[in-house]
């Protein structure tokens, strides 16, 4: 992706970047400009408990699945603390939930994605989610391992580029002024966000040619 290309110096002599996606827009509109997107952090989570026979001696086990369930409920309870302006999204799946129904699950694994509109918002939401995960493990008496990785940074469109693009579209293609969606904020993410943190960038969506 663009992060690796950036790391290797592929953008060292580039002053600005424009990215275009094709999309059916409708409602008489043909192009979106001023597109801003969320950034995200990914988490690989492992809850570690202790196996035991689920019928004979469940009291001897430490149920990792219960830790994960509590952690998810903790995350849900946190949602009202996420500010609307940050467009926070927390998505989670259990990728490994135990081996046998007759055995108290000793290891449960999850994948989590935390999205937000700003870097500060990403860090704040990520910290809260980690707290929720740790609380789930603590309540049952087990352990949790959290491996955080930065995905994409938030996409911040350069408004001057957007204005210039619109002006040229109207002049050279005959586009109508009201055919543009001028503020398109999405909770999705794009690797163009990383570039937008260091140079002027623009991300447009347009219908077919």
Question: Where do the model's predicted regions map?
Answer:
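Metal-dependent amide/peptide-bond hydrolase catalytic core
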Residues: 66-209
